[in-house]
């Protein structure tokens, strides 16, 4: 019986406060010309349990590449992304691409390639393991 008490304490102290999910994203609401808004001053905390994704919009125009980034709800982001899919042709003039992602700062610059990624923890793997552990914990609490 004491094992259940320890498990309940562990779940209460470490898992339940973390159920309020908040993500950080890069945000520049106004289009930025040739500035991908990926420096620290553009980092924001998204609205807890509402804005669960980061969104990136890239428009290629004759003047240069325009960027807009923000926090978004998964529904709004996925609808916008799907709606503009036919206009997304990277490298072509007047292309508009909208992408959605759900890991911290995922709408920032592409990470620099550093040798083998086998030793690095991939965010999607970490998220999967985290949710699996949460499910196990809730099943036993």
From Swiss-Prot:
It is a lipid-anchor; GPI-anchor. Residues 116-141 form a propeptide. Keywords: Cell membrane, Disulfide bond, Glycoprotein, GPI-anchor, Lipoprotein, Membrane, Signal. It comes from the Eukaryota. A lipid is attached at residue 115 (GPI-anchor amidated glycine). The keyword Flavoprotein does not apply. InterPro entries: LY6_UPA_recep-like, Snake_toxin-like_sf. Glycans are attached at residue 45. Disulfide bonds join 25-54, 28-37, 46-71, 77-100, 88-97, 101-106. It is found in: Cell membrane. GO terms for biological process: acetylcholine receptor signaling pathway; behavioral fear response; negative regulation of protein localization to plasma membrane; protein localization to plasma membrane; response to nicotine; synaptic transmission, cholinergic. One of its GO terms (molecular function) is acetylcholine receptor inhibitor activity. Residues 1-20 form the signal peptide. Residues 25-108 form the UPAR/Ly6 domain. The keyword Secreted does not apply. Pfam families: UPAR_LY6 (PF00021). GO terms for cellular component: membrane; plasma membrane; side of membrane; synapse. Believed to act as a modulator of nicotinic acetylcholine receptors (nAChRs) activity. In vitro increases receptor desensitization and decreases affinity for ACh of alpha-4:beta-2-containing nAChRs. May play a role in the intracellular trafficking of alpha-4:beta-2 and alpha-7-containing nAChRs and may inhibit their expression at the cell surface. May be involved in the control of anxiety. Interacts with CHRNA4 and nAChRs containing alpha-4:beta-2 (CHRNA4:CHRNB2) and alpha-7 (CHRNA7) subunits. This is Ly6/PLAUR domain-containing protein 1. It comes from Rattus norvegicus. The gene is Lypd1.
